[in-house]
Amino acid sequence: VVVLALGEKNEWGGEAGSLATIRLPEAQYELAKFVQTLGKPVVITLFNGRPLEVKELAESSDALLELWFPGTEAGRVTADLLSGASNPSGKLSMSFPQTTGQIPVYYNHLRTGRPQTPENKGERYVSHYLDIPNEPFYPFGYGKSYSEFELKTSSLPKELNLGESLHVEVTIKNISDIAGKEVIQVYLQDVTASISRPVKELKAFEKVALQAGEEKTVRFELTSEAFSFYNQQLEKVQEPGLHRVFVGTSSEDVDVFEVEVGGYV
């Protein structure tokens, strides 16, 4: 196995550390491609302080381990993760774009006038790129594990009164032979509101530890606070209308439910 350490210098980020591109120096991409020709499994460990353009690196390696700037325990942590002494369970707090030209790419960006949806995907006059997918390469909340998990969300009510809480019940099972942890994430979308609202907002999450074959049930309560926002008058309000609830293991890998909220508060 080849463990290939790539990334940024720490002075390339932070205050007064702006760059015009989020690609690494080209020599690092060339090195990754060369190492792949050696016929050995390649694991890239990535040291960086920001999301990078990593598509080429991911495609020229067997695994990519995001370490950020890990400090003095970097060697021990890396050895534990790669040897299996520790099981990865972290999730990305930022989306990684397909390419530099896709930034800014946020999971919670505001809706556009002609958003791309599964129903109109492929049409020309919707908000999309012609040469790359709309989705980031690695979405917010993404992260892999040596374990494999299966999620099942109980049916949600179709209607909800203003001021009431929405209860979400999720059953998670470790269907692998390795003990591990997974992060269940719950997002919310206000489909139509008096002001432009994000396409998705993280409202709840919980990291669950499971032994091999173990199953647990996790319950979330989304109170009226989760449905509320500040309007143009800077008043915190909850408005009626259709809401979408997303439950999954990242901002993209989700099951979708619709709940109609009625009345005014």
Predicted features along the sequence, with ranges:
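A short helix->loop->beta-strand "cap" motif at the edges of active sites that frequently abuts
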Residues: T37-V42, S61
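Secreted, periplasmic, or luminal enzymes acting at the cell surface/secretory milieu
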Residues: F47-K181, Y187, K207, A212, ...
